[in-house]
Amino acid sequence: MRKPLLKARQLLLLAYLLAAVLWVVRCLVGCGVMLNYKLQGKMPQTHVDAAELVTESFAPYSSNEWWTPPDDDPAWYLSTDSDPHIYWQGQGYIETAVLDAAHRLPPGGVALYYLKPGQTDYTEAQKVYAKVTAPGVYTFDLGGQWVTGLRIDPDSVGGVPTLFTGIDLNPLHPWYTRFVP
């Protein structure tokens, strides 16, 4: 009878080692791609104020004299139907987008859609759900995409008062976080 080349434990150790090496290579390639776009000036790292964004079915309380905001802050918005949109019109390499929006009622789903070059319509195939990283902070991880537009759906129920200050595109974060799964 022939002995197996590697025992089960050795094979498992080899598989884990190979996975770790592939993870590091993947992260280094991602760093290289990001650095390339950043050096070419094609990776926006900016905060976009609410006034600079286009909204649909998502209006500031100040736009209607009959609406009463929850407090005196001028950044309160109200979704006027169950499918409000916030649009960023621009292009660039986007890894992460962060929505600053504190909701007074449960928002349902908060999602981001992105357009790739040549597209005109947003599709479910290019949809990213938010991860709540702090109260009122929704982070979308696009995994590094060249986009020609973003659409954020800040809630999916309608009638939700939202303290909305804008979005951050590719916010700064420590380099080593790329290696954390």
Protein language model features and the residues they cover:
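Solvent-exposed strand-loop boundary residues in beta-sheet-rich modules
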Residues: K116-T120, G158, H173
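Glycan-recognition and processing domains
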Residues: A20-Q91, D168-P181
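Extracellular ligand-binding interfaces
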Residues: P69-D141, W146
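Edge beta-strands of jelly-roll/beta-sandwich modules across compartments, strongly enriched
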Residues: G158-L172
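Short beta-strand-plus-loop segments that form exposed binding edges in beta-rich domains
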Residues: R151-G159
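Polyanion-binding and phosphate-handling cores
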Residues: D81-D83, T148-R151, L163-T165
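N-terminal Sec-pathway targeting helices
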Residues: R2-V21
